[in-house]
Design a protein with these regions (language model features):
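NAD(P)+-binding Rossmann beta1-loop-alpha1 motif at the extreme N-terminus of oxidoreductases
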Residues: 1-55, 59-62, 190-191
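Internal alpha-helical scaffold of NAD(P)-dependent oxidoreductase catalytic cores
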Residues: 104-113, 129-167, 179-216
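A short glycine-threonine-serine/GTX helix/turn-capping micro-motif
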Residues: 167-176, 225
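Rossmann-like NAD(P)(H) cofactor-binding subdomain of soluble oxidoreductases
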Residues: 39, 48-49, 53, 57-132
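Short acidic capping loops at alpha-helix termini that bridge into adjacent secondary structure
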Residues: 29-32, 89-91, 197
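Catalytic, metal-anchored helix/loop core of enzyme active sites in primary metabolism
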Residues: 170, 182, 271
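NAD(P)-dependent Rossmann-like dehydrogenase/reductase catalytic/cofactor-binding core
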Residues: 2, 204, 208-274
């Protein structure tokens, strides 16, 4: 499909990752407009990407096919107050705000197509994964627009909206789990006598390569782990410690806490709107 023109409201880490990804994917700067809160930030982004910007969200969204909301969840109600009456039914809202349900946008803006999305930070290097779900008025065209935009920074999975809090907890938060594991492995390597530089190179490539095995071989994690776990070997000794000390339960508890917090953020945004 033809590139939809895009307004990005909120150009923090994720918003900027999307802008950069779209430009790499052959969008032109003239096809993007950016909404910022500070003049200095707008000028910085214009110098870097050549896109127009404004402090006024109404000006930013005017005439754009898709409006990406990439502000913090608690900022959504105020943004919707500013946009009330400013959007047309042929525009699509693509919300990246964690926990904020499509109904909140629909109640504020009317019968406008809303697609809720949860990306993750590997989008910075075009290796992201995003779960998306349609609101009540988001038909095929709106979902196609969301697809083509988000595919510029990685993969896209279509889901029902009630699954997106789980997506937030698994893939949205997931990079932090991987980074924490990397931190722990690096520190453990240093305690075993390796230099930090060597430890970082070993750990970073090991995590990258393990992810590639999962993606490219089609084998599941259990099978891949079994392949490197010989009875009585070094990997078996390590797995015994991790399993015995509740590694799985810790991960499950962490995911549950993140999903719960996603729901809480959505509830808080609804209370502010009311």
């Amino acid at each position: 499909m033809t590139h939809p023109t895009v307004a990005v409201l909120g150009v923090g880490a994720m918003g900027e990752a999307l802008v950069a990804g779209l430009l790499r994917a052959s969008w032109q700067p003239s096809e993007l407009s950016l909404g910022v809160r500070r003049t200095e930030r707008g000028e910085e982004l214009h110098d870097r990407y050549g896109c127009s910007w404004s402090l006024d969200p109404v000006e930013v969204v005017n005439g754009r096919d898709v409006v990406v909301v990439a502000v913090k969840p608690q900022s959504v109600p105020h943004l919707l107050e500013q946009l009330t009456g400013a959007m047309q039914q042929n525009q699509t809202v693509l919300s990246l705000a964690a926990g904020v349900v499509t109904r909140l946008y629909e109640d504020a803006l009317g019968d406008i197509p809303v697609v809720r999305a949860m990306p993750n930070t590997p989008a910075l290097v075009d290796e992201g994964i995003t779960g998306i779900a349609p609101g009540r008025f988001a038909a095929e065209q709106a979902m196609e627009q969301a697809d083509v935009i988000l595919q510029a920074v990685g993969g896209v999975i279509h889901l029902a909206e009630h699954h997106l809090d789980a997506v937030t907890a698994v893939s949205g938060t997931g990079p932090a789990y991987a980074f924490l594991l990397a931190e722990a492995l690096i520190e453990a390597a240093i305690r075993e006598g390796l230099s930090r530089g060597v430890a970082e190179r070993l750990v970073n490539q090991t995590i990258k390569g393990s992810g590639a095995l999962l993606v490219e071989t089609g084998k599941g994690p259990f099978e891949l782990r079994a392949q490197v776990t010989s009875p009585g070997g070094t990997t078996a000794a390590a797995m015994h410690i991790l399993e015995g000390r509740g590694f799985r339960a810790l991960v499950e508890d962490a995911v549950a806490a993140a999903a719960r917090r996603s729901r809480e953020l959505g509830e808080a945004a609804r209370r502010v709107e009311e």
